[in-house]
Design a protein with these regions (language model features):
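Positively charged n-region of N-terminal signal peptides that target proteins for export
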Residues: 1-6
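Bacterial N-terminal signal peptides
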Residues: 7-16
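A "functional boundary" signal
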Residues: 20-211
Length: 211
């Protein structure tokens, strides 16, 4: 079944790329990439990278392209070394009424700053994302924002803040019944205990993460 699904996605990708070269437009590719993003970020990334001259896109499309491309790279653990792309999306959406895109722009710029080891800037963007996150986006993003905040605080030796953020993520993932999120939150709590040389407590939480 998984092999068949991969084949279908691959065929869809080939047809999409062909459509692009045969006169299809960037708007279609952006919609297709967005629909594939959550389950197939590698396919979404391929579609986005097939868009020629993204700098010529209209304002909203260029901003969405920046968000989608950064999202795909983040999901595939591609390290970012510059904020120039996602900064355009933040500048475009920061005065917009579209809170979902505004939140995504701040969140993914925060992820880029975390990659760049600019923890102060990352924290500011994650906190801004929390301020504007709409209810319908909480399932995908709320726990992730707190987990990223926790990671930034831990890097800055702000262990109390890191622990608080991990516990917030833990509460959220329990309510959402997201087992994968719970694993990362519990493991994160253990990691913060380890950083504080509280090894017994760290071991307890690492064991909980494995259970």
């Amino acid at each position: 079944m998984k092999l068949l699904l991969s084949y279908i996605i691959g065929l869809f990708l080939i047809l999409s790329l062909s459509a692009c070269h045969d006169g299809g437009n960037a708007t279609t590719l952006l919609h297709q990439a967005d629909s594939l993003m959550q389950e197939f970020p590698d396919s979404a990334l391929s579609l986005l990278e097939s868009i020629s001259h993204p700098e010529k896109l209209s304002g909203s499309e260029r901003a969405d392209y920046a968000i989608f491309l950064t999202r795909a790279r983040t999901k595939l653990y591609v390290h970012e070394s510059s904020d120039s792309l996602i900064r355009f999306a933040v500048d475009y959406y920061k005065r917009s009424w579209n809170n979902e895109r505004k939140m995504q722009a701040y969140y993914y710029r925060g992820c880029v700053y975390r990659d760049m080891r600019c923890m102060d800037l990352a924290v500011k963007d994650f906190l801004q994302a929390l301020k504007v996150i709409p209810k319908e986006s909480e399932y995908l993003y709320l726990g992730a924002i707190y987990e990223n905040l926790a990671g930034c605080y831990a890097e800055q030796n702000l262990y109390k803040d890191a622990m608080h953020a991990h516990h917030k993520a833990h509460e959220i993932y329990i309510k959402q019944k997201k087992d994968d999120g719970l694993f990362y939150a519990v493991r994160g709590i253990g990691y913060v205990f380890m950083l504080q040389h509280q090894l017994d407590s760290a071991l307890v939480y690492y064991q909980k993460a494995l259970d």
